[in-house]
Amino acid sequence: MSFETAFERIVGHAHAKAVLTAALATDRVAHAYLFHGEAHIGKFLTAMAFAKMGLCPHPKIGRSSGRPTLASCGQCPSCLAVDSGSHPDLQIVRPDGVQIKIRQIRDLQNSIVFKPMIGSRKWFLIDEADAMNPEAANGFLKTLEEPPDHSVLILVSARPQALLPTILSRCQAVRFSPPPLQALSPWLQKQRGLGPEEARLLATLSMGRIGIAAEGDPAELKIERDRILGALSKERLEDPADLFSQSDDLAATPEQLDRSLDTIEIWLRDVLIVPHDPDASLLINQDIPEQIMAWGRAVSTDAVLETLTLIHLLKRAAPRNLNHALVLETVLLKLRDAVIGESTTGSKTGEAGRVRK
Ligand SMILES: [Zn+2]
């Protein structure tokens, strides 16, 4: 895989890119960064581009719109080694299964003490850093407390609140937000050679998640969205057996759960907006305004806001090892109460519920 040579080629994240460019241009790269923000919006790709630039012995320095720009050359042995995953001064740590384990952190520690082989720094990218188990996190903290001068550690996380506060406090935090759809659509036209309509639909369906937009098939994404939204119909929510099988199905994997929660969250956002948006220009699901309008008519604004708050809490605070189906079930039960117009304070959950192992 060929990683980007310049930040300009990565859509969005202007602030993050400016901070990182300045760090390299002034040779003030921090020892530890935390790249945080929602999943699939380009944090890891930016980290790879940053490391590639930092490692390249012939970076191109320029200016664009009055700001300094920096690019790796993309052709030297160092750049090619980054692309092929064989650079001796770049190590990537990812969860082994669902966790980052102490063994992986020990490997990092054994490597970080040695001087870089080619470049001037050694780069370590810890993807999904919040997946470190407690033993790994404590081990990692020791490295963060006294990192060797030549090392750069980049923690990438969509759930930074799951990291130890002592880890967070030692990293320079760089926040990433999904790029605006208006920016993503032209980028997709250029990057993927799509027509304007197709690019807009793909930008919409990927919800600003550049990682998905860059690779996703618009037709498949649409089918997936419609499958998730199908679970929100009144008939299906009212059928307890169906509701529980949907919860299992739409939360089969952690990624699937994330997609389902995002899709529901955006749907609810659209439900709030649609009455005030006659030409549907502000909707994210721009292709289905009537469906959004019809669903929204049956539900109170308060219930929608309460569900959004619940989803927000679950996304941020639910521990990684929580039963995924249970998370989605909680949301669907809340929505069921919303569409049948009942308060959630009663024992509805218990009546319809079943015992989960
Ligand atoms: Zn190079």
Question: Which ranges hold each PLM region?
Answer:
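Charged, glycine-rich active-site and insertion segments that engage polyanionic ligands
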Residues: 1-52, 60-63, 81, 149-152, ...
